[in-house]
Amino acid sequence: MINVEIVRNYNKWREHRKINKGLIKKITQNVLVRFDHFDKIKQFELSILLTNTAEILTLNQQFRSIEKATNVLSFPNNELNWHNLYSKLEFLYYSDYMHLGDIAFCYEVIYNESCEQQKTFENHFIHMLIHSILHLIGFDHQNDTDANIMESLEIEILSYFGIPSPY
């Protein structure tokens, strides 16, 4: 079971009714099911903040020391790394619960990117959600090899939902 808490701090998000707990749960489940050790955990929790440029800028400055608005920020609750994901998940064998972390999405940046890239807002949001969940479970794109692995997973999951590759 995946428990999703959503905080909407910006009214524009309400225009996109498809972006809801059900969608977020479905996407999260589709990411996690690809990794065997997650099936041992009975309950996951994920916190979502749907916000605007001003708040994402503040968060980016506060937590990453970057003075720029961004599309999404991921705050993992665990020190996971996909290179040793299975050994790191061994501590979860005896746990029924895992808080994956927090994700903050910026409406204006995602909206502008979706227009520039000629995608629907919802499809771009889904891509950013998949990308963020992968970050929460230890994936990153700090080098070309890791970026290629992460992008391949994103493409695979997006295709499951009928969304073309963004790359």
Curated annotation (Swiss-Prot):
Pfam families: YbeY. GO terms for biological process: rRNA processing. Its EC number is 3.1.-.-. Binds 1 zinc ion. Keywords: Cytoplasm, Endonuclease, Hydrolase, Metal-binding, Nuclease, Ribosome biogenesis, rRNA processing, Zinc. It is found in: Cytoplasm. One of its GO terms (cellular component) is cytoplasm. Zn(2+) binds at H131, H135, H141. PROSITE patterns: UPF0054. Its main location: cytoplasm. Its cofactor is Zn(2+). One of its GO terms (molecular function) is metalloendopeptidase activity. Belongs to the endoribonuclease YbeY family. Single strand-specific metallo-endoribonuclease involved in late-stage 70S ribosome quality control and in maturation of the 3' terminus of the 16S rRNA. This is Endoribonuclease YbeY. The gene is ybeY.
